[in-house]
């Protein structure tokens, strides 16, 4: 994992994400709703809801929006239902692409995802075609500007709690964990007084592909098109610096 900075990729696409902030809030609200519906409205007792709330806060979603989504899930009646679906395929230059969606209409979402791939230099694959190229990881970010950090002290906290790897840059520390150790590492860092800029479960590519400028521009269009879909919650690629 050394040399892979998810944070730098996130910052590189920040302007595009800022332009979609309203849509991001809508998608995260859906995740909060489903998590609260399945496991109850208390994030302290519902790990999936805690993850969704943390994701919302990382996106600067207002607390009122978060509370509204939880309250909606707690209301009487069946309410809404969404299926979790994963689509796999290849983008320009043979880059692997994973698409996670929450949908109330699988046919609609599958059609939209397929069109996005075919119109932007990609191809939708079969289940299992690229998933094996990614590892599920816990991912935590601590900004240097938020702390006077003694790196050895932080490293000790991370390793004792079960962290796997730390990537450092002038701006942030990026901490990776096995999925089963994510909660322990996150809680240990918070108890040690660290403010977490981001804390989530994510998919990390095992190998990064370098694209030329044309391929990168085409992949950016593909990712943008996928992220524009209301049902798509996350898009992961094996491209370097996207």
UniProtKB/Swiss-Prot annotation:
Biological process terms in GO annotation: regulation of DNA-templated transcription
Keyword 4Fe-4S attributed: no
Localization per record: Cytoplasm
Keyword flag Protein transport: no
GO MF annotation: an example: DNA binding
Stored InterPro entries: Integrase-like_N (IPR017856), TACO1_YebC-like_2nd/3rd_dom (IPR048300), TACO1_YebC_N (IPR049083), Transcrip_reg_TACO1-like (IPR002876), Transcrip_reg_TACO1-like_dom3 (IPR026564), YebC-like (IPR029072)
The entry's keywords: Cytoplasm, DNA-binding, Transcription, Transcription regulation
Family annotation (SUPFAM superfamilies): YebC-like
Residue spans of biased composition, Polar residues class: 1-14
UniProt main location, coarse: cytoplasm
Stretches for region Disordered: 1-22
One GO cellular component term noted in the UniProt record for this chain: cytosol
Annotated family: Belongs to the TACO1 family.
Name under which the protein is recorded: Probable transcriptional regulatory protein EF_0663
């Amino acid at each position: 994992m050394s040399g892979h900075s998810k944070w730098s990729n996130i910052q590189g696409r920040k302007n595009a994400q800022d332009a979609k902030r309203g849509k991001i809030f809508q998608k995260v609200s859906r995740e909060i709703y489903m998590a609260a519906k399945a496991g109850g409205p208390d994030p302290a007792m519902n790990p999936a809801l805690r993850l969704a709330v943390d994701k919302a806060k990382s996106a600067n979603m207002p607390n009122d929006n978060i509370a509204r989504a939880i309250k909606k899930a707690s209301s009487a009646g069946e309410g809404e239902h969404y299926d979790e679906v994963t689509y796999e395929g290849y983008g320009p230059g043979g880059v692997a692409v994973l698409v996670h969606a929450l949908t109330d209409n699988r046919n609609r979402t599958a059609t939209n995802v397929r069109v996005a791939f075919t119109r932007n230099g990609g191809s939708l694959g079969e289940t299992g075609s690229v998933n094996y190229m990614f590892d599920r990881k816990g991912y935590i970010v601590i900004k240097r500007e938020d702390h006077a950090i003694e790196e050895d002290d932080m490293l000790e906290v991370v390793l004792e709690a079960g962290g796997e790897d730390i990537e450092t840059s002038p701006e942030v520390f990026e901490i990776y964990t096995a999925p089963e150790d994510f909660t322990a590492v996150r809680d240990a860092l918070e108890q040690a007084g660290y403010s977490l800029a981001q804390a989530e479960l994510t998919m990390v590519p095992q190998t990064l592909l370098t694209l030329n400028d044309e391929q990168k521009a085409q992949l950016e269009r593909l990712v943008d098109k996928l992220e524009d879909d209301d049902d798509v919650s996350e898009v992961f690629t094996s491209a370097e610096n996207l």
